[in-house]
């Protein structure tokens, strides 16, 4: 399972789709970065070993202590801890903030990690980027497929979201070290490597 979704509702929907398609429940989950829409479902996964970068886990542990009053959420936006872009979406998913449950991953790593699934491997790798400093990709060499999470998106914390020239260049350089032709991400349909690099080339950086 690549990322855990935003909530118990997401996890339940995912499990229902697996059941309807005759597929087994996952026993592994990989987190690509700390943002709530990719991680807050983790607490609702049962009998699953999860993986995250050390940076992601540190951020999730910090979030476990967060309060969710309107004032506390507003303060986190003002201090740059959270994105003004994301909170309206979080409010829709969680009208009752007491339902927010946050769990860190069971296994953490730094820089890179290879998971052997038996005939198929998943290579996890941190790459510098604009979106969030803890981002990592998941690459399956046997399938020539890479899962990006949100690593190819801009930083949403500033009032004006931004791609940073140096970090963006390092992202492209880091991705070119992988031989892939299929690209999956957190918020887009399946695309080719050609589509991805065209998208990355067509952004304004600061």
Residue ranges of each PLM-predicted region?
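Conserved beta-strand hairpin/beta-sheet module of binuclear metal-dependent hydrolase folds
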Residues: 1-19, 137-150
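Divalent metal-coordination and catalytic microenvironments
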Residues: 3, 18, 33, 45, ...
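Active-site metal-binding loops of divalent metal-dependent hydrolases
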Residues: 3-6, 33-34, 55-56, 127-129, ...
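Short, solvent-exposed loop/turn segments at secondary-structure boundaries
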Residues: 6, 158-163, 194-198
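Active-site metal-binding motif and surrounding structural segment of the metallo-beta-lactamase
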Residues: 9-55, 176-183
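Divalent-metal (often Zn2+) His-rich catalytic cores of metallo-beta-lactamase-fold enzymes
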Residues: 51, 139, 166-206
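Metallo-beta-lactamase
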Residues: 61-125
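Active-site-proximal loop/helix segments of hydrolase catalytic cores
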Residues: 121-175
């Amino acid at each position: 399972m690549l990322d855990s979704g935003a909530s118990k509702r997401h996890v339940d929907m995912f499990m229902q789709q697996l059941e309807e398609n005759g597929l087994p429940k996952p026993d592994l989950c990989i987190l690509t970065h700390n943002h709530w829409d990719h991680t807050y479902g983790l607490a609702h996964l049962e009998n699953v070993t999860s993986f995250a970068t050390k940076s992601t886990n540190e951020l999730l542990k910090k979030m476990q202590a967060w309060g969710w009053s309107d004032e506390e959420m507003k303060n986190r936006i003002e201090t740059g801890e959270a994105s003004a872009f994301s909170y309206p979406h979080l409010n829709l998913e969680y009208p009752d903030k007491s339902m927010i449950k946050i769990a860190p991953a069971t296994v953490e790593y730094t820089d890179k990690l290879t998971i052997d699934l038996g005939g198929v491997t998943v290579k996890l790798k941190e790459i510098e980027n604009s979106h969030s400093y803890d981002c990592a990709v998941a690459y399956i060499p046997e399938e020539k497929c890479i899962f990006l999470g949100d690593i190819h998106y801009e930083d949403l914390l500033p009032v004006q979201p931004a791609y940073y020239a140096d970090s963006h260049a390092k992202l492209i350089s880091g991705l070119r070290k992988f031989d892939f032709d299929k690209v999956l991400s957190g918020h887009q349909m399946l695309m080719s490597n050609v589509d991805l690099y065209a998208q990355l080339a067509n952004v304004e950086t600061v």
